[in-house]
């Protein structure tokens, strides 16, 4: 398979992946960036964090995004390689993404810089080939703030097999979302995940009343979802399907910060589902 010189791609050939299939193929597409924390910078971006955790739990994980042709871009690709994250990363003439993160009592707030590389992800033939073989694909709303990445993410996600898990991990940041974007994404997804703050935003945005369960079932029926997943921080997490509800309390831990906690949850959830757990 020929690979564009614009693409940094460290993975097996599609033929090798198809032949082995010893591990589920999990794809994350969206923002790849540096979180600029008080303690220093850390590689991040929700879909890429998801891929990392899914890979640690046994998946054949792949990240799809874009970086700038700059030092930060080189460093973040090196970071992916160091952590054995396979990737399809395009180099584009925009700076590598950064996010300023401030922590108050371990809770992060974000200042997300605009006109960066991950606003310009392209639907390469390699990315489409990969999506067609995916057992699960994860995408969010943040990386869809630009028209180009929005069209790319929706196009690539649409190539995932019908029986694959298509996880929409809502990430409502700053002003980078609206009802139209969320609805477009919901029609592509079959699993919807959000935290309790995002739940309240969506309930207001869609003009819904009723209990948490009633709202969850409304989304499931309206958009044909397999499940609705809600995380509530230190309290609990709940998974709703048409037939069942499963709630677990959050284990007590010493919190350093919660950056990426939701992505770790998503990775563990998808791997558990792919292993046949209920």
Segment roles from a protein language model:
Residues 136, 140-214, 236:
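Conserved beta-alpha-beta core of the PfkB/ribokinase-like small-molecule kinase fold
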Residues 8-12, 115-122, 172-177:
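Short gly/ser/thr-rich secondary-structure transition/capping motifs
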Residues 60-141, 159-162:
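Conserved N-terminal subdomain of the carbohydrate kinase-like
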Residues 129-130, 184-185, 221:
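Structural alpha-helical scaffold elements that stabilize or flank donor/cofactor-binding regions
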Residues 3-25, 210-278:
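Conserved phosphate-binding/catalytic region of the ribokinase-like
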Residues 2-85, 99, 255-256:
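Glycine-rich phosphate/adenosyl-contacting loop at the front of the ribokinase-like
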Residues 54, 195, 262:
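Short, conserved phosphate/pyrophosphate- and ester-handling motifs at nucleotide-, phospho-/glycolipid
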